[in-house]
Design a protein with these regions (language model features):
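Conserved donor-binding/catalytic core segment of Leloir-type glycosyltransferases
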Residues: 157-179, 185-188
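Charged active-site motifs of nucleotide-sugar-dependent glycosyltransferases
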Residues: 19, 136, 161-168, 196
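A short, charged, and often flexible helix/loop element on the N-terminal side
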Residues: 1-7, 22-29, 88-95
Length: 209
């Protein structure tokens, strides 16, 4: 998207009929959020039948800069002093407090354009709605296409019910504290054979059933 906005603008505005422009993870070291919003405003003015959809996969939309809060609630009070400069995306100088008001104004501008915010995460949606208004972000859970996920066909037959509660922990990288807290790991370890644990992701800290 960001290689040539002019080219994308021409492609979008020359497309006949309604169009959906769907954003996912936009935050990175080079993202200019104001430029993205200006682009969307320009497109909407030229093509009123376009719809913007933005899927929120983390908390970047509510914080000054962090994608993961890691238990920090400073975003609720203006990100006055960031406790984790190494949190993704890492920085050398903390400017979250200065950037936060303008950043939130950009999200309000997207809402004014009719952007539909969605998230597969309840807690991400709750955080967004607490700032921008109830119902502004809707939940659409991630699904699995069982027709194409051949790994499912290779799974062994289900054993008899153990009677133990089943817990699933799902993340791309299970060793990252932003995805799997050490407090959760300790709590699961303490339960031992009282539960049946299933993990989906790499580098989990617990071995065994």
């Amino acid at each position: 998207m960001f290689g040539n906005l002019d080219k994308l603008y021409r492609t979008v505005t020359r497309t006949n009929g309604p169009l959906v422009l769907h954003f996912h993870v936009l935050h990175s070291y080079w993202l200019n959020l104001e430029e993205v919003v200006s682009f969307c405003q320009k497109v909407k003015a030229h093509k009123p039948d376009i719809t913007f959809v933005w899927t929120l996969h983390d908390h970047w939309s509510v914080t000054g800069r962090c994608a993961f809060t890691d238990g920090c609630e400073g975003w609720k009070t203006g990100c006055l002093q960031c406790p984790t400069l190494s949190n993704y995306p890492p920085v050398k100088i903390d400017k979250a407090h200065q950037q936060l008001p303008g950043k939130r104004q950009m999200f309000r501008a997207m809402l004014a354009l009719g952007c539909q915010f969605i998230s597969p995460s309840q807690h991400v949606a709750d955080a967004f709605n607490s700032l921008y208004g109830a119902g502004r972000c809707r939940i659409i859970n991630n699904g699995i296409d069982v027709a194409t996920e051949t790994i499912l066909a290779e799974l062994p037959a289900m054993p008899e019910e153990s009677g133990r509660p089943k817990i699933a922990v799902v993340a791309h990288d299970l060793r990252y504290d932003g995805k799997t807290s050490q407090q959760l790991v300790r709590a699961i370890t303490a339960l031992g054979d009282k539960i049946e644990l299933h993990t989906f992701g790499k580098f989990f800290a617990i071995c065994g059933r």
